[in-house]
């Protein structure tokens, strides 16, 4: 990322802070890949692997952002560049619920796991159709926070993914209400219920409810001092998969919080990327 000046329609780059790095490393350019759904445009991107050869096939990773009221863009995303360097296609989309497209687009209250899930599956379908080099039998899914919630949800509703990495996730809005530092405001607002007003509705939106349907090997990554998506949420989903015989592991980071991937200790951020790629390599490569 650099500073630019836009004047009279002319863009001029002012800095070159990353020139040395770019000259010594391969940075894979994301390809803009929007899809249309019932007259609605969803902005997505595809990053081909660093060693892309159109005559070869590669595993692919669906990456899901947090929020949900955040948004991906055509920016340098370190985690995705690491995956591309390891030989993966990486694809990601701003589903309904994302920011930057107005309130109506971002409002998915009481629709978690429904309209967003449809968008992720439709996007994946179209990416696979456009890129026959992606092996449909070697697909992975990962995400953090809301992206972790959706990773938990997805593996309970489809068997198309051969591996998953659920990061700083939550899986149960009933318990999350009482243990998350934002649960008592976020959950009633987004799920339109509390444990006292409509516990059945909250349970319908809980990925852990669908644990008996999961077959996808799943790694859980959590920080011990994460109070947004507390450790108890990760443990619930992990324990549920273990109980139902699904291959799963959990990796915990001491002294880290919800910001591990962004502002955690460098050695921990490096380790997180290692355990993430190691799990995916074991199941997809």
Q: Each predicted region: which residue ranges?
A:
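Cap/lid segment of the alpha/beta-hydrolase catalytic domain
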Residues: 15-137, 142-144, 178-179, 185
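Active-site-proximal cap/loop segments of hydrolase catalytic domains
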Residues: 95-285
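Structural motif
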Residues: 1-4
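Short loop/turn segments that connect beta-strands within beta-propeller blades
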Residues: 7-9
